[in-house]
Amino acid sequence: ANRLFFIFWEACKADNRCYGICYLKNRRSGFSFMSSSETVNQATISSDARFGILSKTGADAKKMFTDKVVPISTHYPFFFKPIQDGMDRPKTELAYRVPASKLTRKSITSTTKSNTDALEGLDTTIDWKNTGDNSYDGEKLRLLVHDESGKWERPDNILNNWRVTKTTLRLGS
């Protein structure tokens, strides 16, 4: 069943008109883990992109991020893993970019070879947001995982959020 899911997912990614999949599933089918692995996979091969996670509550989105996305990234082999900024087990954002370095007068005026051979990062991030109608408003997302979106609690509404996130996905593609 997972093979068919990923074949269909590849077809969705190839179609520019497609925003994604509304995947209805049985309990304990592993969708959260499959979507987390696809998020990390896409993030490690994309440059200058943003990936997001929303769930039925902000606590569930954070749990998906810390318990699924971060361990998948942590267990990547060193030859697939891009340069990462921040902690090895982040709580809010997984950033594939070159860590910031302190600017000094010497480093600004220096024209040594080390400045010209600077590392290049992907400038890609994966993060999660609290559940809300305006989550990810005004941002550009390459991929958004709506986990358990049918279980949103009032007053938040998935339809109102979709009006916002549809535009962010269109801008980020």
Can you say where each PLM-predicted feature lies in the sequence?
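Phosphate/NTP-binding elements of NTP-utilizing enzymes
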Residues: 1-173
